[in-house]
Amino acid sequence: ERIVAEIARFGVTRRVSPYLMNEPFLDKTILDKSRYIARHVPGCKVVITTNAGKLTREVVDDIVKDNPFRAIYISMQGIEKGPYESTMGGSLVFEETKRNVEYLMEQRNKHLPGLKIVMTMIKTSAIDAESAVRYWKSLGAESKYTVLENRGGNLPGFNELNVGSKRVFKDCTRLFKHAYIMFNGDMVLCCTDYYKTMVLGNVGETSIYDVWNSPRAVELRRNFIKGDLRDNPLCAKCVISGSS
């Protein structure tokens, strides 16, 4: 509640996504939390990204009753069972996920025409991203694919999955635009910092404003612009698909 109050007080936040390194719908209270944010920070967009594995009919029906989201992004690698399940991993089953997404779209079309649904995926050697994008667009969803990245060096299979050339992600804008806050209040430099190698501070001990504007955070951003990554191993290791 204190974090939401701070966001509301400054009035400059365009988007709040109440999750980071997890599947948000594993949290049984995610809709209540999202509604709280939407009520107390009415000027911002509440946006969620999900793999749709837990986006069941019951959850979708609950969203329809009182929708807090401006947009729902669904991460779904491809539109074929084998490549999808091998890429997504875990216990996700292609038919179940596809059924969940189609029910969401059906209910959106009936009851929530203003809710934006975007199907997203990463272009890799394992899936036919172009065909998947065409399929979802044919059903009325927005759809796109993005280029593969090694997530600050945290994706060991990058070279096998990469299509084409690769380069250092030196034009990234994440560290200038987004504050990534973990479950314990630690603000990390990037959404790819799974192991908390670049912790800027803790918003529970101070505030979002203080951590974002701390000398360490400011210096890291300035050095990134200069191309000096000596004290920033996360960005130094980050490689994306494509040429400079």
What are these regions (language model features)?
Residues 1-152:
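Conserved glycine-rich "GG(E/T)P / GGGxP" loop and the immediately following alpha-helix
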Residues 99-102, 106-116, 134-170, 186-187, ...:
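C-terminal accessory region of radical SAM enzymes
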Residues 173-175:
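Short, small/polar residue-rich loop motifs at catalytic or cofactor-binding pockets
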Residues 177-179:
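Hydrophobic alpha-helical transmembrane segments of multi-pass membrane transport proteins
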Residues 181-184:
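Short, acidic, Ser/Thr-enriched surface-loop or helix-capping motifs
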